[in-house]
């Protein structure tokens, strides 16, 4: 009955939702038909000036003569990377002129009836060749995108004469970013710049089929077939771009050098600029040609001789200035180049005079802004500045010191560990009276409060126990051991927020904790085998979450950060039950090792017991009583005799009777 009750509402729901489903299906069909229409399928988002995406829709073809449009020309859809607003890989061609050439292998040279060319550019020149595609030597076919008198156009020759399609309405040498699209299908061609009007070219006269039909009527029958074949061959020669061999970009080989930037070149499926950036062996680059995003050798990232925590990374972000970025407790930022266009002019300004760009930044002018993305890696603590960042629970380490070691540590920049402040440590700075142990560890979160819920993923370590580097008795901590917020002097390292962003804690200890030590390196204890036992809670102890990193005011820095060997092997504390604050004891590690040993012994004993039980069972099975076996055999014999065939039993009885009869007859004869 339960399935029937569940099924009934489901059927009712389907009946209720059927109009919605029909409406949704109809809407999808109408939307797909609408988007596939010629006027709306060609919506393009052009990669306009830096940071601006221009959305536009291509207008309809003006129908001049229906006969000239026998085969539609698919020119309105530019490559996907340009439709989505991504400019693509960008190369800058300098004032001296440069050339980027691609050569097809001899056995891979294509011949095409339809060509598609799309490229983004910005320049201030009035004359220059952007791109030229040439056929093999001796054929003479070519296709050239060039600027003449500030107007951009395409000239191509596929066997007859030079055919030019030009955008004559507006000049493009305004230093702004433009996207030009050209498509050829046979002798038909179209050219469009940005969202401007489409420029078209169609051959004069009727179509090839009509001309062939007219010629066949006037040609004798015996010559009709050879003439038709000749015309078809001639027509193919006049519509096919034969044996394309090279693509040259820059125009310096034709004495018409291009100066500016080219982005996202697409030609018949080839992304030549992308291939050049990837180091394609068929591409050669000569002259003043540079990939946007390449950092010159003189301005490459370099690091000073300071410690890694305070290293200053210099990154050249523009060609007119270099930016110095100082990062504390961070690895050098990652530099990644992108294909996004970052400027629309050759200079950093919109000035069209290229000569004025040469004197900036010591001769590094005349270039574009580098598209540099600086990703800040995960902040690393000072304890392990060169190790992978692995989030661990917070850690507090108590280090035993003497007065001599305290004075040496203070001179080296390590904060004081005793209660006496600067009097015991020998520090002359009056502002350091309350300095305690500066602790750096892993963790995240706000000020420690067990009543507050965790605020991020790492705050699940809400409580933890402390582990000492030396063997200290639990009774040592019965005194007034407390952790308190630091009091920072004017020359000390300071966090921006003591309990929030910096999360730096100081701990002052009583003189009872100052004990002599004979080793400078703490013992290496396994991080995963500590502090699994419960301890009595100490109500006098207040613990704060320890910092992962803190910002250092470099104008007030008086000593290096704490990266001495005494902090290298900091054991990791494992959190215990929430809400209980605990103090470490010397018996923690001992009891942990004994429990581990007991566990191993128990496992071995259990295995031995199982083996003994198995051996005993096998022994009992092999030495069972033999009498039972004989009894079973006898019963089987009786059972088999009882189940035997009646005919066999009869034969046996007859043979027995005949034997007895013969014996009697023999006895008779003997007596007679």
UniProtKB/Swiss-Prot annotation:
Q: Its GO biological process terms?
A: angiogenesis; cell adhesion
Top-level lineage group: Eukaryota
Kindly provide the PTM information from the record.
Processed by alpha-secretase leading to the formation of an extracellular soluble protein as well as a C-terminal membrane-embedded fragment (CTF). Proteolysis of these CTFs by gamma-secretase releases intracellular domains (ICDs) and extracellular peptides.
Segments carrying the region annotation (Disordered) are: 319-340, 417-454, 495-532, 640-672
Compartments in which it is found:
Membrane
Please list the residue ranges that the record marks as compositionally biased, kind Polar residues. 502-522
Boundaries of every Laminin G-like domain copy:
89-289
Extract the InterPro entries matched here.
ConA-like_dom_sf, Laminin_G, Neurexin-like, Neurexin-related_CASP, Syndecan/Neurexin_dom
Keywords in UniProt for this one?
A: Angiogenesis, Cell adhesion, Membrane, Signal, Transmembrane, Transmembrane helix
Question: Where is there biased composition of kind Acidic residues?
Answer: 421-436
**Gene Ontology terms, cellular component aspect?**
membrane
Function description: Neuronal cell surface protein that may be involved in cell recognition and cell adhesion.
Entry protein name: Neurexin-3a-beta
Q: Please name the source species.
A: Danio rerio (Zebrafish)
Q: Which gene encodes it?
A: nrxn3a
